[in-house]
From Swiss-Prot:
The name this protein goes by in its record: Structural maintenance of chromosomes flexible hinge domain-containing protein 1
Catalysed reactions listed for this entry: ATP + H2O = ADP + phosphate + H(+)
Species assigned in the record: Homo sapiens
SMC hinge domain segment(s): 1720-1847
Modified residues (N6-acetyllysine): 1349
Start-end of Gly residues biased regions: 1-13
Disulfide pairings: none
């Protein structure tokens, strides 16, 4: 093809003569594509090795006939322009070049580019034939297609948008032969890259030099989750292998981005074979370069489909298409027939590329994720069929999707292998749900069998969920490697012994491993090379991933805990509830009869099934319908339990038809059927049984339901039929199976319902009667009133039972009522008394029928009323239940108010008994009129007298009547203020009406009055009026007073005012009296006695007879008016006449000033009130002496008076001068005197000048407010908060009751709680000392006051809250978590530390406060029980480096296996304990030691007779291996048990033989136990009579290196049967006695050991008490021998008080806020790291280090950098790991004036290293490093002179460091001093940035004493407690009960000795006790037993009780 399309022959050449005529030439092929008419072929051109671009271009122009001036470009096929710079590296031999008008010009016609690829075509073509092979029945074709998808994923990895990959199966014969096309929208390939693709095994890592590649300069992608980096096109073989596996020809079509050309390459087996046959270059070919959508070169009909594919290129910017033709027929069939299978396989391979790192999770909302852009679509086109199109994202049944969606939880981990090898792993848990495993089955390769119908008596055993499938599928760079899987790892394989989770849980996990490219895979990507080997290498590190973070931990324990958690959370089993008991089921085979637990309910998948519930079965023949009776669960269960399997017992329904019970597996219950459907089936079956009754009334008189009938009404005859549900009549029960001859009867009953119960009054039974089925006659005897029920009941013929098969037979009940009949007679009801004349009343009537039942009147009747002497009539009579004759009125005379008796006859015409007599008593009626005496109309009386009236109240028949509240009034008119007469006539109806005297004022002549007499309560009674003539009275009526002046008398009227000079006397007062007729009355002695005056107690009677009154003294004050009164009083009148004396002022005498509005004036303000100035007389009475002109004469003077605002005004209304605007110049508060002067008068007043109104709040005795005050969380503030109200001039404002409050943030808590305070009388409020609780950091407080509804804000207090380094918050427990805990051994060491709030370890803690508790874990909870074992910590060893840690060493592990809980506690105080997290340990059995029986058999007694029973030694003997503590162990041991008979003497050869005449027998030992069913002697076996022999059971276990102690069973041998029986009884008694003796001895030994331990404890407590007492004596503290605890308590209280006072004393402190310690790597600010006791030294050193005081010291640079970042670089930091420590000073070095240990000169000023004055509360070593670097060898002396002298001397011998003086001077190390920069300011100028002072030494001494006293108190209490326990134990041992037990032991030992003698057991046997009993622990006489022994004794004493003995 190249020759055909080539240019002219030979071609041109370019070069120089030195090129040697072709040697070293390069041949290039040139296509001229400038114009469309250009030649189609290429022109070969020879280029010399040394040619340049200019020569080459000239040659091109010459060859193609182009003018050199013409513009054109020469490019490569990749459109790379050839220039001078790239000519040599681009123009290579064989290269194809374009001649274009521009680089971006379209190819007007296609070109062909020669390419070479190295391998033989057979290597290429057949590479795919054998690389893809089938494994486990899988077709490899999907894996070959996956190779092409790999290439597409790599090509699209850089796509920003959708990464689209299409696989098109073109199987439509009308479009050509079958083909497979894989198309992607990746970056495409240039022609050179396409050439590279054709080169076999050209890996991306080896493409360099001549090979241009999209992977040139390969760089590994950055790590991403699951290694989903699309870097999976790897080796240069996959695509070609896949192509030639699928078909025999491949067409590669590709267009790179930003390229104008499409490159096309065809490789085919046919073409290769043709070239080989023609001896052509078989590994060369052509790449066709063309424009997009150009398909003119497709001429073969077999490839017609390519036209459509090429047309689609127009819309694509870049793409690559692989078109495979010549597809193998078997592949075509597979692709067609198994479309879903292989697309599902591809979805599995690329699951995580399609769905992302988390897989195909079921998401509730569609989230946009970076992996949603991969779109792999597969389509298959067939002739005449709708195309099949599937997107791999839509496939939901690939295995990974099934794994993801059926998993309940996941466990993620990571493995690091050989450096960069990383494997991410995930394990998913598929729980068991009720009756099935949820582990997904592969739909294509199902491993589970279909459900088969099981027999009812079979047990369904659920097999493992995963089956034999491995756990892990393996993914490489995110894609599946299908033929490699990993079975498991050591840490996730099922354990040999039961672990935390059941074994079956290990079969419920699936997993996936995701490796990066550091693991080798085969070139076909089917298998890993060595993944499993590397992962299972011992150096592989597994870590767990939690919340995306990698955590180093024990992967096996973490996995076990996770699996246990999954099992507990997600595994769901059937819950059996309502436990009823355990039974055996004899209906089952013998091995399955029991035990069976029975339950009344189960809970299955949220649904509850209970006994009695209707259910239906499935998979049973026939299907069962019935009700649940109970549930069965195999096993000895007790209470509620979760389990699988189980059976349900069903009572077949309806029971009337199916009287049987069936039992089926619970799994066969139909959970889908509704209970309604079951109920309907039962009802349909029940339709055959009698259902209802049909009742008719052939003769009438029908009884209707709920009918009400009159008494005596008959009930008609009844006709009855029995019907079933189908409406069919029946007379007997259906079906022969139910005893079909059973007839049915109908029973009739009439029942009366009464309050006393139901009473049966009629009862009949009817049989079926042929024509009339069932019949009952008419009933006429029902007369009683009440509710009735007529009941018809179907009953059985023989038994009269009304139920059948537990179901009631049909019945019918008709309820009716019987009421009364029509009325026949009557009687009177209860009447309303009394009866009054003219007052209507009612007569109630009661009617009865003929049976005496109460009836009602329903007809019209006119009653007749008659009574002698009375007039009677009525209004009406009412009908109905309450019949009443209404409105009966009687009129006539009665004798008195008590009334009169009458007989009233009532007649009702029409009744059988029509009349009745009613006796009544008639009382007088209501009042109707008044009768008044005297009868005269005009009455005459004198004024001032009373008048009586006689009144009577009468009714309408003129009878005197009475009633309640019958009150008669008499009202007078004609004058004011007349009295009212009242009289009560309620009882008698008559009385005398009178009252007070009639008094009319100022009556001068006769006057006429009117009197009206009436009854207010009786409006119907007319009033009576009388006329009264009133005459004037002759008694005293008026009194007058006169003042006589000369001969003239002036009347002083009543209430007159008399003006008189103040202090004077009024003389000559007289009086006169007159009657009502104005007649003067002469004063007699009797009248004079009745005259009184109020101004003097003594009256001259002689003067009164003359009409003279006593003199009146006038008051001295004009304000004090005098009230004078003259009064007269007798029996008729009371008179008075009064006047007021008003004093008048005298002459002017004084000037008086008066303050109004208070005498205090606030500073800066005017006096609120005014000063009023007046002129007074001698008595102080004001005189009107001022006028407006008087103001000029007034002067005001005072010290500090501000006269600028003084205002004086004349007050005309008060005749005074007002002075306002008094103000003082601000100054010290106090009293101010003011002098007021007017003319010759003057006066002084004193004013108090006080502070101004509150304007400020100041803090008293508080540090600087600008800096934050450091406070440790939970501690007190340094000072109390005291605030003072001040005015604006800072004068204290003494305003009390002003509310003071603190404002703060909600997260800042103060104790005591923030309450409102009020200021005291000084204006000061003490808020007290607060304890502060807040999160660490800066917080603010502000004091505010509320004054006059306005807020006065005080200063803001800044608090820097620091964590409390002394407050314990948790316990840190460290121990070896990999250690195993064997019973009876020793625990690993536990290291406990108490962690404070700042995450540091709290040190100096009394070890006695740390304890360890251990108890056995139970189901009741994790709280420690009361009897939990408690341990104390061990003493600190020398090699214990960590300070503040406590160690629990060598603590004994419990003897019994099980799960134990350990918890450590720190006693914070007497009541609060800080507990650690609980440590759960599993105690395992110890080493196997001995062979023991499960149940110790009795000592056998046998003989050698024929009877097997007499020769049987052992039956059902179970032997197992235990450790020293009787824990069963050795479960994994396998071997044999050798049974041998031995005698007491080794020489004894005449020993019995086993059956078979053998001396030894072997028994298998499996799973830690051996079962010996029976052991029988041989018949006529040798042996001596009455001799004891031994059976030695010796274990032989090959896997166990040590020898175990055998089990030895003694037995007695006899030759005589009878003797054997006797001896057997004795042997049994001997065994009982032996057991009893052992129990008694155990009790006594345990009691004695407990006693010894108590003595030991007493001794230890006594020694401890003595030791502490001696230590207290060293501190001069003596403790008395009596009343020790009260004395210690008092001492402690006093010492604590002293210590608290010392701590509260103010001492120097650093107020610089400390930096919050975020971690243990932060030490704090330098100012807080050290303390200095001396104030002067502290001042100068703090100043010297002023620039460093704020620096935060950290241990690491990382921590420093973190603080730097947090503060944006504002905080200076100092990391200790950056300090060069070799230059640090030696803290032990002597001062410079010492040379070689000798004094060089005598210094002055007490020199000392500055660093030696520092004390460090914490972190001493780190602090020495810091201050050693900062201070170096700085020396401090007393003063500057001493420092200068010291320096002068030191420099003579060595370098002199910086010198500081206690006076604050500094001499630098260079000798410079002086100036402000070398002089320390005063302490208060350092702004709190000063080193604090340490706690006083006395405080530390007190702390030691307090600690000792507390320990001594505990020791005294402990000694007292153990003494009491010892005494109690001694008393217990002396009790009669213990003595009795001792006697019983002695008797048992005697009896045992006698029995042994009878048995013939000689003392020789006792030497062989070692054969049967393990050696006992030796005890010594030491009262203190070993620790282990004491513990054992204590435990045994706990266990052994009296009942055991």
């Amino acid at each position: 093809m190249a020759a055909a399309d080539g240019g002219g022959p030979g071609g041109a050449s370019v070069g120089t003569e030195e090129d040697g005529g072709g040697v070293g030439h390069r041949t290039v092929y040139l296509f001229d594509r400038r114009e469309k008419e250009s030649e189609l072929g290429d022109r070969p051109l020879q280029v010399g090795e040394r040619s340049d671009y200019a020569g080459f271009r000239a040659c091109v122009c010459q060859t193609l006939g182009i003018s050199p001036e013409e513009k054109f470009v020469i490019t490569t096929t990749s459109r790379k322009e050839i220039t001078c710079d790239n000519f040599d590296e681009t123009v290579k031999d064989g290269v194809t070049l374009y001649l274009l008008q521009s680089v971006n010009q379209l190819l007007l016609t296609a070109t062909k580019e020669r390419i070479d690829f190295l391998p033989h075509y057979d290597t290429l073509v057949k590479s795919g034939m054998y690389e893809y092979y089938a494994s486990e029945g899988q077709n490899p074709l999907p894996f070959a297609l996956a190779e092409l998808i790999d290439n597409s994923l790599s090509a699209t990895s850089r796509n920003i948008g959708v990464r689209r990959i299409q696989i098109k199966l073109l199987f439509d014969e009308t479009q050509g032969k079958p083909a497979v096309a894989v198309i992607d929208n990746g970056r495409g390939m240039t022609s050179k890259q396409l050439n590279n693709w054709a080169v076999y095994r050209l890996s991306k890592f080896t493409r360099q030099g001549d090979f241009e590649s999209d992977h040139s300069g390969y760089v590994r992608p950055v790590p991403v989750p699951r290694s989903l980096n699309s870097d999976i096109s790897y080796f240069g073989v996959g695509g070609k292998q896949a192509v030639f596996f699928v078909g025999q020809s491949a067409r590669m079509i590709s267009k790179p981005a930003d390229s104008q050309d499409v490159h096309e390459l065809v490789l085919s087996k046919e073409d290769f074979e043709k070239k080989e046959k023609n001896k052509e270059a078989i590994y060369s070919g052509y790449i066709r370069n063309r424009k997009p959508s150009d398909s003119v070169h497709i001429t073969n009909d077999d490839e017609r489909f390519l036209h459509h594919l090429i047309i689609e290129e127009k819309e694509k910017d870049s793409f690559t298409a692989v078109v495979i033709t010549g597809v193998q027929p078997e592949h075509i069939q597979y692709l067609k027939n198994y479309f879903h299978l292989w697309t599902r396989q591809l979805a599995h391979i690329y699951h995580y590329y399609i769905h992302g790192p988390k897989g195909n999770e079921i998401r509730t909302s569609k989230e946009v994720e970076p992996f949603n852009n991969i779109d792999i679509e597969i389509s298959m086109f067939e002739k005449g069929k709708v195309p099949k199109i599937v997107n791999l994202r839509e496939i939901q049944d690939d295995m990974q999707t099934l794994y993801v969606n059926t998993a309940a939880d996941s466990f993620e981990f990571k493995a690091h292998v050989e450096g960069d090898g990383v494997v991410e792993g995930i394990i998913r848990y598929h729980p068991f749900l009720y009756d099935r495993e949820t582990y997904p089955d592969d739909p294509c390769f199902p491993s589970k069998l279909k459900d088969e119908d099981d027999e009812d008596d079979c047990f369904i055993l659920e097999k493992a969920a995963r089956g034999k499938r491995p756990i892990f599928e393996c993914f490489w760079n995110g894609r599946l490697i299908p033929y490699t899987s990993v079975e498991d790892f050591d840490w996730c394989t099922p354990p040999k012994k039961r672990g935390l989770a059941p074994i079956e849980c290990y079969n419920r996990i699936s997993g996936a491993l995701f490796t990066n490219d550091k693991f080798q895979v085969s070139t076909n990507k089917l298998t890993f090379m060595d993944l499993e080997l590397k992962l299972k290498d011992k150096n592989t590190l597994f870590t767990r991933i939690l919340n995306g973070q990698e955590q180093r931990m024990k992967i096996d324990r973490e996995f076990a805990l996770w699996l246990k958690d999954c099992h507990e959370k997600y595994d769901k089993q059937i819950k059996f509830t309502l436990f009823k008991g355990v039974i055996t089921r004899p209906d089952l085979p013998s091995k399955k009869q029991g035990p069976w637990a029975t339950y009344a309910a189960i809970e299955w998948d949220g649904k509850i099934y209970k006994a009695g519930q209707l259910v239906k079965t499935i998979k049973t023949l026939p299907l069962f319908y019935g009700s649940i009776v109970r549930f069965f669960l195999y096993g000895d269960h007790d209470g509620e339990v979760y389990a699988t399997g189980g059976e349900v017992q069903i009572a077949m329904e309806p029971q009337a038809l199916y009287d049987e019970v069936r039992t089926v597996p619970i799994a066969k219950l139909d959970r889908t059927v509704a209970e309604k459907a079951v109920k309907k089936y039962v009802e349909d079956e029940m339709a055959r049984l009698p259902d209802r009754l049909s009742v008719t009334w052939p003769e009438g008189d029908e009884l209707l339901p709920n009918e009400v009938r009159p008494a005596g009404t008959p009930i008609g005859a009844l006709r009855i039929e029995i019907l079933n549900k189908k409406g069919e009549a029946m007379q007997k029960l259906p079906g022969t199976s139910h005893g079909g001859s059973k007839k049915l009867l109908v029973e009739l009953k009439v029942i009366l319902h009464s309050s006393s119960g139901n009473k049966e009054i009629i009862s009949h039974i009817s049989q079926h009667g042929g024509k009339w089925p069932y019949w009952f006659k008419k009933m006429e005897n029902i007369q009683k009133l009440g509710n009735y029920t007529l009941k018809l009941q179907v009953v059985l013929n023989e038994s009269n039972a009304d139920t059948y098969a537990g179901r009631p037979l049909p019945s019918k009940a008709i309820k009716f009522s019987v009421k009364e009949g029509k009325p026949e007679k009557f009687s009177f009801g209860l009447l309303d008394l009394p009866f009054r004349v003219g007052v209507p009343f009612n007569i109630p009537l009661e009617f009865q029928d003929e049976f005496g039942h109460t009836s009602q009147l329903v007809t019209d009747i006119q009653p007749v009323l008659e009574a002698s002497g009375l007039s009677l009539h009525y209004e009406e009579i009412t009908k109905g239940p309450n019949c009443v004759i209404r409105g009966v009125t009687a009129k006539g005379p009665v004798n008195s108010c008590q009334g009169k008796n009458y007989n009233l006859k009532v007649t009702l015409p029409g009744l059988k008994e029509d009349s009745q007599i009613l006796k009544i008593r008639l009382l007088p009626g209501h009042p109707r009129r008044l009768k008044v005496k005297p009868d005269s109309e005009i009455l005459v009386i004198e004024n001032g007298t009373a008048f009586p009236f006689q009144v009577e109240v009468l009714d309408e028949s003129d009878n005197i009547t009475a009633q309640p509240k019958l009150i008669v009034h008499c009202k007078f008119s004609g004058a004011p203020n007349l009295p009212v007469y009242v009289v009560d006539c309620s009882s008698s109806g008559t009385s005398i009406l009178t009252g007070s005297a009639i008094q009319v004022q100022n009556i001068k002549k006769d006057q006429t009055l009117k009197a009206r007499i009436e009854i207010p309560s009786c409006k119907d009674v007319a009033p009576v009026e009388k006329t009264i003539k009133l005459l004037p009275s002759s008694h005293v009526a008026r009194l007058q007073i006169f003042s006589v002046e000369g001969q003239k008398a002036i009347q002083i009227k009543h209430q007159d005012e008399v003006n008189w000079i103040a202090g004077d006397i009024m003389h000559n007062l007289i009086f006169q009296m007159y009657d009502e007729g104005e007649r003067e009355i002469n004063i007699t002695s009797a009248l004079a006695e009745k005259i009184k005056v109020n101004w003097t107690p003594e009256i001259n009677k002689e003067h009164l007879l003359q009409g003279l009154l006593p003199d009146v003294q006038v008051p001295t004050s004009v304000k004090d008016m005098r009230y004078c009164q003259v009064s007269f009083q007798d029996d008729h009148v009371s008179l008075e006449s009064a006047f007021t004396v008003r004093p008048l002022p005298d002459e002017p005498k004084h000037l008086k000033c008066e303050m109004k509005g208070g005498k205090t004036v606030q500073m800066g303000q005017e006096l609120q009130g005014e000063v009023v100035i007046i002129i007074t007389d001698q008595y102080g009475n004001q005189i009107q002496a001022f006028s407006p002109s008087s103001l000029s004469s007034l002067s005001i003077a005072g010290v500090g008076l501000d006269s600028s605002n003084l205002k004086t005004t004349f007050q005309e209304n008060t005749q005074s001068i007002s002075v306002r605007g008094i103000k003082f110049i601000p100054g010290p508060p106090g009293n101010k005197d003011l002098c007021f002067t007017w003319r010759e008068f003057s006066d002084f007043i004193r004013v108090q000048l006080i502070s101004g109104p509150p304007a400020k709040l100041l803090l008293i005795d508080w540090p600087e407010l600008k800096e934050s005050i450091p406070v440790i969380n939970g501690r007190d503030l340094q000072n109390p908060i005291i605030v003072q109200l001040c005015d604006q001039w800072d004068n204290p404002a003494p305003v009390q009751h002003v509310k003071i409050s603190l404002t703060k943030a909600s997260n800042l808590k103060l104790m005591p709680s923030n309450q409102q305070h009020k200021t005291d009388e000084k204006g000061r409020a003490n808020l007290g000392v607060f304890s502060v609780f807040a999160p660490r950091g800066e917080h603010t407080l502000q004091v505010k006051a509320i004054y006059n509804k306005s807020i006065i804000e005080g200063p803001i207090i800044k608090l820097m809250i620091l964590p409390d380094p002394e407050k314990p918050v948790r316990l840190n427990v460290k121990y070896d978590k990999d250690a195993s805990f064997l019973a009876g051994g020793l625990f690993t060491d536990f290291m406990i530390s108490v962690i404070s709030e700042d995450d540091s370890i709290i040190k100096n803690i009394n070890p006695a406060r740390i304890s360890m508790k251990m108890w056995k874990l139970s189901t009741s909870g994790n709280r420690p029980p009361a009897n939990a074992e408690t341990f104390s910590c061990n003493k600190i060893k020398d090699n214990d480096k960590e300070d503040g840690c406590f160690y629990f060493r060598d603590k004994v592990i419990p003897n019994k296996v099980g799960t134990y809980c350990i918890q450590f506690g720190f006693m914070m105080d007497k009541t609060n304990i800080l507990n650690s997290e609980q440590v759960i340990v599993e105690v395992l059995p110890n080493q196997p030691v001995k062979l023991v029986p499960k149940i110790k058999p009795p000592t056998p007694a046998v003989s050698n007779v024929r009877s097997v029973a007499s020769r049987t030694l052992v039956r059902d003997l179970h032997l197992s291996i235990t450790d020293d503590y009787d824990n069963h162990t050795g479960i994994d041991l396998v071997g044999t048990i050798i049974a041998t008979i031995k005698g007491s003497n080794e020489e004894d050869t005449d020993t019995p033989l086993f059956i078979g005449k053998v001396r030894t027998l072997e028994f298998p030992f499996v799973n830690g136990s051996a079962e010996i069913m029976s052991l029988v002697l041989a018949e006529s076996s040798p042996g001596r009579d009455s001799t004891e022999y031994f059976i030695v059971f010796e274990p032989r276990l090959p896997l166990l290196s040590r020898t175990l102690e055998p089990y030895i069973l003694p037995f007695m041998f006899y030759n005589d049967v009878k003797k054997q029986q006797q001896m057997a009884a004795l042997t049994k008694e001997k065994d009982q006695l032996s057991q009893s003796i052992v129990m008694y001895k155990s009790l006594f030994e345990a009691s004695q050991q407990l006693l010894n331990e108590m003595k030991c404890q007493v001794e230890e407590a006594r020694l401890k008490e003595a030791q502490l007492r001696n230590e207290l004596k060293i501190h001069n503290i003596d403790i008395p021998t009596t009343q020790q605890v009260p004395h210690i308590e008092a001492l402690l209280k006093r010492k604590l008080s002293e210590q608290e006072e010392l701590k509260k004393k103010p001492r120097r402190s650093c107020t610089l806020p400390n930096y919050t310690k975020g971690s243990g790597d932060v030490l704090g600010k330098i100012a807080h790291l050290a303390q200095i006791e001396d104030d002067r030294a502290a001042m100068v050193i703090s100043w010297h280090l002023a620039s460093d005081m704020d620096c935060v010291v950290t241990l690491t640079t990382d921590a420093a950098r973190r603080i730097y970042d947090e503060t944006q670089g504002r905080q200076q930091v100092l990391p200790l790991d950056s300090i060069y420590k070799k230059t640090l000073p030696d803290w032990k070095r002597s001062l410079p004036h010492f040379r070689n240990g000798k004094l060089y000169f005598k210094p002055i000023g007490d020199p000392v290293f500055a660093r030696d004055l520092l004390t460090f509360p914490d972190n001493v070593e780190h602090c020495e490093t810091v201050f050693g670097m900062l201070l170096g060898d700085t020396i401090i002396l007393d003063n500057l002179d001493a420092a200068n002298h010291y320096r002068k001397e030191v420099v003579k011998i060595t370098h002199c460091p910086t010198l500081l003086t206690r006076d604050g001077d500094r001499i630098r190390s260079n000798g410079k001093f002086g100036g402000l920069q070398n002089k320390a300011p005063p302490m208060d100028k350092l702004r709190g940035m000063v080193f604090g002072a340490p706690v006083p030494k006395q405080c530390l001494i007190l702390g030691e004493q307090i600690d000792l006293l507390q320990q001594y108190r505990s020791a005294v209490c402990k000694l007292d407690s153990v003494n009491k326990d010892l005494n109690s134990q001694l008393e217990y041992l002396r009790t009669p009960d213990m003595r009795k037990k001792k006697q019983e032991l002695d008797e048992h030992e005697k009896n045992l000795k006698l029995i042994e003698e009878k048995l013939g057991m000689t003392p020789i046997r006792k030497c062989n006790d070692s054969l049967r009993h393990s050696p006992k622990v030796e005890t010594t006489d030491c009262p203190v037993p070993p620790k282990r022994m004491r513990r054992e004794a204590t435990r045994q004493n706990r266990i052994i009780t009296k009942t055991d003995v």
